[in-house]
Amino acid sequence: MDVGVGIDMGGTRIKIGLVKDGQIIAATKIPASADTTLSQRLNELADGVDMLLKEHRCTPTGIGIAFPGIVNSDEKKILSKYVKYPDAQKINISSWTMERWGVPFAFENDARAALLGEWQYGAGRICDNLVLITLGTGVGTAVLINGKMLKGKNYLAGNLGGHVSINLHGAECNCGGTGCVESEASTWALQKNVTRSPKFNTSALCREEEINFNSVFMWAAKGDELALEVKENCQRAWTTGIINLIVSYDPERVVIGGGIMNSKDIIIPYVKDMIKKNSWIKDNHIEVVPAEQLEYAGILGMSYLLTLIGKEYKSVI
């Protein structure tokens, strides 16, 4: 069977999927292993792809990789100075893919890939003015305007909503900024933000082996004072970031993804209420919906890009 191969290089796990006609035939995950170089990780990644193809007797028609950083999707280059893998900018990922499989290759930022996946196969269907925000290891964003992906001269446009400063007196972010949405309310910042609170030693959170958003929301529901405070701060940070995206890009719909959306019944009403209070246009109705493709939006987005190669690739992205 001929399939497109989608690879989503997330902050914690790398996901590999075989896609046929917009359907995932098979998928697997491997650890992101940020303590290795990208060149080392790519070899292990390729072995994982080949094993999945062999197991399901499939032949690749193209390889699409979603990468967690700023990328030049036209020249297929990694542009970020700060990326998960220190050698990433030195890797010619297009040549590596061609040498390994000899098939067409698509390359995109992971948030943009997720937006494309939701636009074509999930919560963004039938909507050409769309904002996606993913709440996970970091905070990723992407923007679609009139059916075209927003990129800008340096491929930054719409992609750095997680690095908008919302607290001038906040924590330092790993990007070098202060009080970014990401440093205020992302998974990588959560443990540090919680443990430095003077309320930590008397909070139930101090007994948790791992402090994550599931534990914060669980203890908040039980009335823990610190958990309630952290939950409110994070929801306000996420919503402030979303409002910044709305006033900047005027979307019809906002899609929120990431593992934290297990608590969507709490988060979505909170976000909607704050947006309504801060709307510039009377009766402006902006849809706020949870992502539908929580696991594989990036893989589906990359498989969609593969179908455009040689067709209307430029008109969409």
Task: Report the location of each language-model feature.
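Glycine-rich phosphate-binding loop of actin/hexokinase-like ATP-binding domains
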Residues: 125-184
